[in-house]
Regions:
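Sec-exported extracytoplasmic/periplasmic mature domains
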Residues: 62-74, 92-96, 104, 136-139, ...
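C-terminal motif of bacterial Sec signal peptides marking the signal peptidase cleavage site
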Residues: 17-22
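N-terminal segment of the mature folded domain
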Residues: 29-168, 231-233, 244-250
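Extracellular/periplasmic juxtamembrane helices and adjacent flexible linkers that interface
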Residues: 25-27, 32, 40-44, 174-179, ...
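Extracytoplasmic ligand-binding site segments that recognize negatively charged/polar headgroups
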Residues: 131-135, 141-231
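Ligand-binding pocket segment of bilobal, Venus flytrap-like solute-binding proteins
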Residues: 88, 189-281
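C-terminal lobe and pocket-closing loops
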Residues: 262-324
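Bacterial N-terminal signal peptides that target proteins for export
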Residues: 1-10
């Protein structure tokens, strides 16, 4: 799906509202974000910036694009929401200038990306933080309490009916139907899958005997491509359950997840709580900011199934214009205005001021090798 020219802010006085299309769904973008984006340091002469990757970021990128293009009218941002794995591959192949990914580059990918960046450092910038919702479709039921091991058993296809005693034990006031559970997973390589399976591998114990992986590790009951595809599959069946970036949930039922002795519903604030409490990845350089999430937290305000999505870029580009465009656009993305635009449109958690300062310090160093 290509997100291009989502907004033409010919004049804010005339633009009472902006509707933008992302993956076939209309999104209303508050014109105030265009005004906020006017503080962006636009690139002289404009140009076209191409990115690809995370479908979880899709709606956020749409909001960023609309506001940024409104402020920098001679610049076009093209973002293809092909999924995190494909986005990383396109970046490594040099097909796009930046990538969006729900997982940071691993060691092998970093080596490949460094070669693509002609020997310059490649960095992971956590710019989009969102809960991963465990979403389901059961008539008359909007919310359920699910412990990590129960979620693991459901997606490992060991718990097969909604009125199973393990589900019923934590939902005594809910009349659970004798309906077959149909887990829905991503069919494509996905950072959302990698984050979700990383959580299960850490928190679900023996109920999830698989390692974290961007590819679903077992034979699926049902699978769909992209975040929108998973939501459509859940909506299309009764008894279905899946995992998806919270911005895509819509009217589906969602789970409150077991944390410590209680259950925590997803929210931007609850997602931010676990991110702020988690360290950066061991071995990061000064400019790299990949995060190691603490999935075993017992913090009662923290929602533990979180997607931290990154913008991946070279620290040096051969083409000066590309360097300027990446620097300008990513500066808006991590800015307070950009983060608020994303939060307003998707329910994502704005990054903290401390994180913003670190990311901006790295972005400020992006330049051209010639």
């Amino acid at each position: 799906v290509k997100l291009s020219k989502y907004g033409q802010f010919a004049g804010l006085a005339l633009a009472g509202s902006l509707a933008l299309s992302a993956c076939g769904s209309d999104q209303a973008v508050d014109p105030k974000h265009a005004a906020d984006a006017r503080n962006v340091d636009c690139v002289d002469g404009g140009g076209t910036l191409s990115g690809a990757g995370s479908s979880a970021q899709e709606n956020a990128v749409a909001a960023w694009t609309a506001a940024y293009e409104g402020a920098c009218g001679d610049t076009t941002i093209n973002y293809d929401a092909v999924g995190s794995g494909a986005g990383r591959s396109q970046f490594i192949d040099g097909a796009v200038t930046f990538a969006g990914s729900d997982a940071a580059l691993d060691k092998k990918e970093t080596e490949q990306a460094t070669e693509r960046c002609k020997g310059s450092e490649v960095v992971n910038l956590p710019a989009y933080i969102s809960p991963i919702a465990v979403a389901f479709n059961l008539d008359g039921i909007d919310s359920l309490n699910l412990k990590p091991e129960v979620i693991g058993d459901i997606f490992n296809q060991k718990i097969t009916k909604w009125n199973d005693e393990k589900i019923a034990a934590d939902n005594p006031d809910v009349e659970l139907p004798d309906t077959k559970i149909v887990p829905v997973n991503r069919s494509d390589e996905s950072g959302t899958t990698e984050n979700f399976t990383a959580y299960l591998a850490e928190a679900a114990g023996d109920a999830w005997p698989h390692e974290a992986d961007g590819n679903w590790p077992i034979k699926p009951a049902e699978a769909a491509q992209g975040s929108s595809g998973v939501v459509s599959a859940i909506q299309g069946g009764q008894g279905t359950i899946g995992y998806v970036d919270a911005s895509h949930v819509g009217g589906l039922g969602t789970a409150s997840v077991g944390v410590g002795d209680g259950f925590v519903a997803y929210s931007p604030e609850a997602a931010a709580a676990i991110v702020d409490a988690s360290p950066e990845r061991e071995g990061n350089t000064e400019n790299d900011h990949a995060i190691e999430l603490d999935y075993l937290t017992k913090e009662s305000s923290a929602y533990p199934i979180v997607l931290v999505s990154y913008e991946i870029a070279c620290m040096e580009y051969e083409d000066k214009k590309n360097a300027e465009l990446v620097k300008s656009f990513l500066s808006y993305v991590v800015s307070e205005a950009g983060q608020q635009a994303s939060s307003d449109e998707t329910g994502s958690a704005p990054i903290s001021s401390e994180t913003r300062d670190k990311l901006q310090a790295t972005i400020d160093k992006i330049g051209a090798s010639a």
